[in-house]
């Protein structure tokens, strides 16, 4: 599974500005989804890879980013 890492309190994606390989995104993806996860910056959001199937990713149901 893959997807954008999401802030559970705001419903927002984690923003990033350095596209491609991005240490911040990799660190955040691993922190939220476990050390097996990968991550990089795609379309100015942190995109996480190698997630478990039940991983919660953006968008959150009934929670819009504002």
Swiss-Prot record:
<dbReference type="GO" id="GO:0019871">
    <property type="term" value="F:sodium channel inhibitor activity"/>
</dbReference>
<dbReference type="InterPro" id="IPR044062">
    <property type="entry name" value="LCN-type_CS_alpha_beta_dom"/>
</dbReference>
<keyword id="KW-0964">Secreted</keyword>
<dbReference type="InterPro" id="IPR018218">
    <property type="entry name" value="Scorpion_toxinL"/>
</dbReference>
<dbReference type="GO" id="GO:0005246">
    <property type="term" value="F:calcium channel regulator activity"/>
</dbReference>
<dbReference type="GO" id="GO:0090729">
    <property type="term" value="F:toxin activity"/>
</dbReference>
<keyword id="KW-0872">Ion channel impairing toxin</keyword>
<dbReference type="InterPro" id="IPR036574">
    <property type="entry name" value="Scorpion_toxin-like_sf"/>
</dbReference>
<protein>
    <recommendedName>
        <fullName>Beta-toxin Cb1</fullName>
    </recommendedName>
</protein>
<feature type="disulfide bond">
    <location>
        <begin position="12"/>
        <end position="65"/>
    </location>
</feature>
<feature type="disulfide bond">
    <location>
        <begin position="16"/>
        <end position="41"/>
    </location>
</feature>
<dbReference type="GO" id="GO:0005615">
    <property type="term" value="C:extracellular space"/>
</dbReference>
<keyword id="KW-1015">Disulfide bond</keyword>
<keyword id="KW-0800">Toxin</keyword>
<dbReference type="InterPro" id="IPR003614">
    <property type="entry name" value="Scorpion_toxin-like"/>
</dbReference>
<feature type="domain" description="LCN-type CS-alpha/beta">
    <location>
        <begin position="1"/>
        <end position="66"/>
    </location>
</feature>
<feature type="disulfide bond">
    <location>
        <begin position="25"/>
        <end position="46"/>
    </location>
</feature>
<comment type="similarity">
    <text>Belongs to the long (4 C-C) scorpion toxin superfamily. Sodium channel inhibitor family. Beta subfamily.</text>
</comment>
<feature type="disulfide bond">
    <location>
        <begin position="29"/>
        <end position="48"/>
    </location>
</feature>
<keyword id="KW-0528">Neurotoxin</keyword>
<dbReference type="GO" id="GO:0006952">
    <property type="term" value="P:defense response"/>
</dbReference>
<comment type="function">
    <text>Beta toxins bind voltage-independently at site-4 of sodium channels (Nav) and reduces peak current and shifts the voltage of activation toward more negative potentials thereby affecting sodium channel activation and promoting spontaneous and repetitive firing. Has an inhibitory effect on voltage-gated sodium channel hNav1.6/SCN8A, affecting both the activation and inactivation processes. This toxin is active against mammals and lethal to mice.</text>
</comment>
<keyword id="KW-1218">Voltage-gated calcium channel impairing toxin</keyword>
<keyword id="KW-0108">Calcium channel impairing toxin</keyword>
<dbReference type="GO" id="GO:0044493">
    <property type="term" value="P:envenomation resulting in negative regulation of voltage-gated sodium channel activity in another organism"/>
</dbReference>
